[in-house]
Structure formats: structure tokens, C-alpha cells
A protein has these predicted regions:
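N-terminal amphipathic/basic leader segments beginning at the initiator methionine
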Residues: 1-19
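N-terminal small/glycine-rich loop or linker at the start of catalytic domains
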Residues: 21-49, 115-137
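Structural preference for beta-strand elements that scaffold enzyme active sites
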Residues: 26-30, 71-73, 111-115, 152
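Glycine-rich, proline-tolerant flexible connector loops at the mouths of alpha/beta enzymes
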Residues: 40-52, 69-96, 123
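Non-catalytic positions within long, well-ordered alpha-helices that form the structural scaffold/packing
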Residues: 62-66, 154
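Alpha-helix-loop-beta-strand connector modules within alpha/beta enzyme cores
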Residues: 84-118
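Acidic, His- and aromatic-enriched active-site or binding-groove loops in soluble protein domains
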Residues: 97-105, 135-147
Length: 154
């Protein structure tokens, strides 16, 4: 399956991200989403950045938009019990990361540009960014898995 989406210029947020001469319009705000409710936990190594549940994340993004930040990068924090060798959680439609994508799109639509992390390392039990076959990372299998994850996130 060939899926090669492009960053198009259909929305103002996308045009600003790609063509703006203003630095603030080109910034991408990182967000780390966790399961649960009312979670707003600071990340010690990243001052000003928190691990947040979806309910808190939606409020944070609304505030970011008020301050002119329209580009957002979503990283899903996967609990150890949901990790496996092929990063199943990364494309599980019932996992908080994908639910967050749906909620963000529903609440903010074309006001924002939303990026998601499709790297396998956060959802694999071995921590590598690829699918391991016979003790080696298999690039072809990994690319196919990344495509599946990207489609789930879209």
C-alpha cells in the first residue's frame, strides 16, 4: 500500500507553519499524553512540559492557541503492561494516544497542525525503534509497521 500524504496548504495553520517569517508561527509545542484523568505531571528534564491526561491536554492546547501556538506534537506515554515486541499499542484505536488525536481534531479542527510520534521505541518492550526478527531489526517489516501506525494516527 502506498500512502504518501503531503503537508498541503489548505488551512491557515498549515500555511503559517510552512511559509511564515515569524518564528513563533514556526514553533511546534510538544505534548506528552498519558492515560487517566486530571493528570498534569511535570517532566523534570523538560521545564514547562508535562505529562497530561487528555482532559488536561485539551485545556493546555486551548491556552497554547490563545498564545499563538498552532503547531503541536503529540507523544504517547505507553505503560509497560501495554508494550510488546511489535508496538501494538501504537496503533490500538482504544489507546489514549489515538483517542487524544481524535479529541484534539474534534475540538480544534483546522485551527492547529497536529503531528504525532510514530516511532516504535515508546511502545516496544525492547525499546528499539524497529521490529526485531532473528535478533536484528528488520527494516522492511519496520517500515510496514510504521505505515500502519501512521494510518491509525491519521
Amino acid at each position: 500500500m502506498r500512502v504518501r500524504p503531503r503537508i498541503n496548504r489548505w488551512t491557515e495553520a498549515r500555511r503559517n507553519l510552512v511559509f511564515s517569517s515569524s518564528i513563533s508561527k514556526s514553533l511546534v509545542q510538544p505534548h506528552f499524553v498519558v492515560s487517566g484523568k486530571d493528570i498534569d505531571e511535570p517532566i523534570s528534564g523538560m521545564p514547562g512540559i508535562q505529562r497530561q491526561s487528555i482532559d488536561v491536554l485539551l485545556k493546555t492546547i486551548a491556552e497554547d492557541i490563545k498564545h499563538g501556538l498552532s503547531a503541536h506534537m503529540l507523544f504517547t506515554v505507553v505503560e509497560p503492561e501495554h508494550k510488546d515486541s511489535v508496538a501494538s499499542a501504537a496503533s490500538d484505536m482504544d489507546m489514549h494516544g489515538i483517542i487524544a488525536v481524535r479529541e484534539i481534531k474534534k475540538h480544534f479542527g483546522e485551527q492547529i497542525v497536529l503531528f504525532t510520534d510514530v516511532c516504535l521505541c515508546t511502545a516496544t518492550d525492547h525499546g528499539h525503534c524497529g521490529i526485531i526478527v532473528d535478533h536484528q531489526i528488520d527494516n522492511d517489516v519496520t517500515v510496514q509497521r510504521l505505515v500502519e501506525i501512521a494510518i491509525a494516527h491519521a
